[in-house]
């Protein structure tokens, strides 16, 4: 279990109910249980049960240390203590992961921890991770057009957005700007959670918010993507934040605003996944039309 966040309050009503649901779920698991020691909630759940913990925390049973984030990769060492022991941790080995971001270091450490719990040798698991290229819609490189790099990610909750944007800037990145395009999801979620996004875009130079992707939920009067914009502007009055509700206007804005050296990251769990292709297509057709006029 990586972390527990506020979500689906329309179903659970309170965060305490969410935590209780996870606690009951973990209790029913007969096999190995691996929990993140860096997350306060999962650490609390782990303390009540027989679990193996992982993370960057000194309290973790399996730790990622000496982390280097550069060249779009993550390199780190792994220390571990024997199961059931409180003794000092010992160096197990090193990992060279072809994925960027602290969150992927933690995910890889979780996978290593579970693999070792199941009897897989560390060197075998680490070798497998060294060739893991990630999955679709997780910092998914969608193309480079005239110097602009387009990335798409499924991130749609505040902590996910923070992790993605933080991961977009490693020691060797030289983007001119990071332009974050966020498509909020679910009217009922945004009606109670819009303010939670206020500090999620700190690592973006420009933030563009679209209208809400319904995911089958019913529109609520007054609940639009503008709520997210207002939340960001209240906490960060100097940040450039745009609210562009209509898709055609959004594509046109990005096609004309993005310049060479920019990184454009589209985020959300709706049809924003198609946005990079739409923007690239318009930019290319615009250049073709300009060339014909000469």
Model-predicted segments: where are they?
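Short, flexible loop segments at boundaries between secondary-structure elements
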Residues: 209, 284-294
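A glycine-rich beta-strand to alpha-helix segment
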Residues: 249-282
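Acidic, Mg2+-coordinating active-site environments of NTP-dependent enzymes
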Residues: 1-150, 230
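Active-site beta-alpha connecting loops in nucleotide-dependent enzymes
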Residues: 135-137, 159, 167-236, 243-247
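Short glycine-rich anion-binding loops that position phosphate/pyrophosphate groups of nucleotides
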Residues: 5-7, 39-40, 156, 184-187, ...
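Glycine/threonine-rich flexible loop motifs
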Residues: 9-17, 189-191, 217-221, 274-276
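Short active-site oxyanion
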Residues: 29-33, 239-241, 262
């Amino acid at each position: 279990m990586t972390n527990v966040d506020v979500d689906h309050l329309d179903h659970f009503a309170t965060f305490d109910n969410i935590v209780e649901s996870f606690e009951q779920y973990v209790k029913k698991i007969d096999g190995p249980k691996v929990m993140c020691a860096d997350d306060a909630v999962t650490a609390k759940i782990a303390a009540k049960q027989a679990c193996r913990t992982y993370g960057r925390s000194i309290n973790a049973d399996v730790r990622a240390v000496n982390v280097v984030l550069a060249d779009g990769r993550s390199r780190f060492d792994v220390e571990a203590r024997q199961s059931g022991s409180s003794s000092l941790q010992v160096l197990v080995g090193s990992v060279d992961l072809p994925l960027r971001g602290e969150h992927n270091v933690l995910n890889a450490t979780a996978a290593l921890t579970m693999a070792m719990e199941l009897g897989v040798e560390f060197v075998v698991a680490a070798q497998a991770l060294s060739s893991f290229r990630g999955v679709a819609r997780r910092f998914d490189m969608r193309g480079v057009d005239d110097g602009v790099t387009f990335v798409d990610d499924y991130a749609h909750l505040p902590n996910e957005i923070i992790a993605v944007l933080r991961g977009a800037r490693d020691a060797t990145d030289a983007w001119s700007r990071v332009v974050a395009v966020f498509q909020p999801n679910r009217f009922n979620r945004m009606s109670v959670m819009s303010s939670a996004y206020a500090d999620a875009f700190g690592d973006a130079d420009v933030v563009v918010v679209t209208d809400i992707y319904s995911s089958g939920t019913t529109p609520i009067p007054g609940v639009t993507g503008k709520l997210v914009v207002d939340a960001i502007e209240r906490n960060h009055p100097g940040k450039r934040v745009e609210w562009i509700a209509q898709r055609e206007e959004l594509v046109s804005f990005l096609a004309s605003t993005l310049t060479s050296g920019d990184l454009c990251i589209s985020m959300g769990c709706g049809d924003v996944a198609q946005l990079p292709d739409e923007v690239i297509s318009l930019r290319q057709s615009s250049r073709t039309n300009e060339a014909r006029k000469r």
